[in-house]
Amino acid sequence: KKVRTSDGFIGYVQTNSLKHIKEETISSSFEEPQYTGISKDYKINMAWHNVENTTANGYIQDMLASTKSLTTIAPTWFHIADTQGNLNSIADADYVNYAHQSNLEVWAVLRDFHGGINSADETYEVLSHTSRRTNLIDQVIAAALQAGIDGINLDFELISAECGEDYVQFVRELSIKCHQNGLAFSVDNYVPMPYNTFYDLEEQSVFADYVVIMGYDEHVEGSYEAGSVASYGYVKDGIENALKSVPKEKLINAIPLYTRLWFETPKTQEELAAEAGTEAADYPNKVTSTALGMEDAEKRVQEAGVQASWDEDTRQNYAQWDADGGTYKIWLEDSQSLE
């Protein structure tokens, strides 16, 4: 029979050796800790602001002039400098002050790419060490408080399955530090798929104030076939799958304000032969693409002299035309597709 001693050792003894047997119900006084966060009493309308250098901080006025109804702006200010967890920051207090004067909160973005590190292995090197996580978190909080920032938006996109547990622990630790300092905390995520479950949306939702689903990149640069960046079905599935793990009041779906112009040409026999036995061989056309903003995309369609028509499957306006020895295809993001 399996037994345990009073000081916690577990083992087995023969049943016929037991004496003075009595049954007792053991209860635990353990109470699961409750994590309180920051919840806004309004709908979050957030825009990421890609800021690559300190000079670009001065463009906030121009950026806001072309927007409306925003509540939150998220400049890409924080990057991991090295595998020791040091921080590169281009945070700007004047930027924050201008945003506040425009009735906007500033949630600075912390990224694991486009900085000193730029690979899954390097991200793992940082997150797999408690001391390096702590170093990074302390520097992020200090920089945020110095600039008067209102929140942190975590955008780590180079997480491997091996790094999953360490990443989630980092989310826990950063969340606690943010809340201790009055900072809102949100986390960006890919559309949930079976291959990225290690991002652990359910555990994120315990600690993060908001969980953001990046509802785009259905087809990306390097895809084997042309397609929409964010078709209706893709976005809908992403939201519904996220809601299985995240409370609806914490979920934010991010939409693209860009699309891709695709160019297809038939593969030659030589190209098909070279790809034999690979996934690429299943696709008869060679495909390249260029990312375009909404206005530039509509301009390209007009310049081609074609009329886009509504595609019910993707719920987007679609156009294609032949030129330059191949076929151009584009699924537009416009006011109709965003409704």
PLM region spans:
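Terminal peptide-recognition signature
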Residues: V3, L154, N253
